[in-house]
Amino acid sequence: MGDSNTLADDDSRVVADAQGRLADRSLHDHTERLAPNMYEVCDGVWCLVGNGLSNQTFLRGPEGIIAIDTGDSVEEMRSALDHLRRVTSEPVVGVVYTHFHYVNGTAALTEHEPITAIWGHERIAQNLERAATEIAPAYSRGLVEQFGIQLPDEGPDGLVNVGLGLAYRMAHHAPSTPGYVAADHTFTEQVTVNLAGLEMQVTPAPSDADDSVTLWFPHFNVAVHNLVWPALFNVFAIRGEEYRDPRVLLNGLDHLRSLNAEHLVATHGPPLSGKQELERRVTAYRDSIQFLWDQTVRWTNRGATGPELAHRIQLPAIYDEDWLTQQHYGLAEHHVRQIRAGLFGFFDGDPVGLLPLDTTDEAERMVSAMGGAEKVRRLCVEALAGTDNDRRWALSLAARLAHRPGATQQDQRLLADALRTAARRTTSANVRNWCLTRALDLDGSIDMSRLRTHRFGRRQVARWSLEAAVSVLRVLVEPDRLTGVDLHLAVVLDGERTGIHFRNHIACPTEGVDAEAVLTGPRDVWNQILTGSSDVRNAVDSGNLSIEGDTARVFQALAAIDHPGFE
């Protein structure tokens, strides 16, 4: 089907905006769709776009206003409330979460508005905790890279947009105070409820989150959803996420189509209206996802590897006619590889990936086999000046040079140059932001090292359950330090008990029953240890924590934790 046209051969489509930010022309055009605007969807329904990564939606019921999604911070939601007050003075009485991504501004409502109910999926709290504990460093690093959080505001590397919004967090919402308030009414399956005097039909519709729902308001003929975005749906998130099965997504899209809505209001992008227009556009959106899944299975059955899928499967030109299915967020070539991995795992049948060398070893050997570093550098410079697949070749060469143990600053700069070339020529905001963040890290403009270790914030730790605050140690174990160690430790903080069993080079979470030793003290002291403002030895020596049992064995076990609070 030819080139997907999402990574240009040259700079002919690259333009600079008024702030000097270099990007594909279509990505600049996409920014206009995400511009701040309080849309009046219909009488009594408003959607605020451009206030943050997500929209905030408001519906007027007989008993007051319903707010759907509260953004990423208290400041963001206060801004949304200010916009609401320009169109109505009616009180906000209900809150609904479409999924766990945009729930952090609710405190802005509960502190002043007469909220009677907060509705959300039962899994929201669990999903929030998962992202903030064991996988927190990788998750946070992925957010920084995908959403360009450390990119400058202007200049060639400046942030243009993040595909679904103008930015992950708007600068004028600093310091972006978290204000999550848990739902006091939850659902796990399809249900119809009355909120603010309005009938609201809730239907689970997993998309980029397994707790995502579609909300149908028959009175307004409006569906609020997390399915049809202002760009091709992101089966694969470059930041790293759990597998999003397109077959499940298709069920949600088919349900959305079946509503025959007059208005669709998404979590991202401008609202859409008109039954006939919606039927055509949502059907095409749905079919783009089926196309990717069907063709991935077709070519996988024929033996194609991941990279082969990326080049053989191209979205037909029809999908480039509507911005709903254009590749301004993720890329189809990544989505098909993710679908294959989701179905069959990481190994795609290529012997190269069966028993691979360590990255640095492979780079060293390949550079040597190609004639040495200087020759590879020349090849890389030539490729950067070329067209067609030369840009991909340049990235491959530069990465091998930079991965070598003896990599020089010149090698790092070459890789940064290759990444910047890809960044300005891609239509994908995700790829642009990722490439530029890595380039800035390589050339020393920013420092990402702090995001490659477990770093816990005070407010973050305070929100965890006791079980989460102790079981997180399992992913901090330096296994060699547990050689010969077998100790079951109970941890009792503020009278609440949990436990962890150090054995066989792991730390296994337990309930702390029948433990050989007990660590006791205030939860606040444990939080200080996790955040690095104290350490376990000093806490015990000062009497803030006490140990019942063999103190030496407890310290030996805890010393296996790769964290300054325990070493």
Where are the regions that the model predicts?
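Accessory terminal helices/loops
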Residues: G2-H28, A136-R141, I149-H173, S258-H263, ...
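Metallo-beta-lactamase
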Residues: Q19, G64-I66, D72-V74, Q126-P204, V248-N260, ...
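Active-site metal-binding motif and surrounding structural segment of the metallo-beta-lactamase
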Residues: R33, M38-V41, E63-G64, E75-G120, ...
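Conserved beta-strand hairpin/beta-sheet module of binuclear metal-dependent hydrolase folds
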Residues: A35-T88, T214-L227
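Short, hydrophobic/aromatic-rich segments at coil-to-beta transitions
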Residues: V41-C47, T186, G197-Q201, L482-A490
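Divalent metal-coordination and catalytic microenvironments
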Residues: G44, L59, D69, L84, ...
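Feature captures hydrophobic
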Residues: W393-S396, H403, Q412-E567
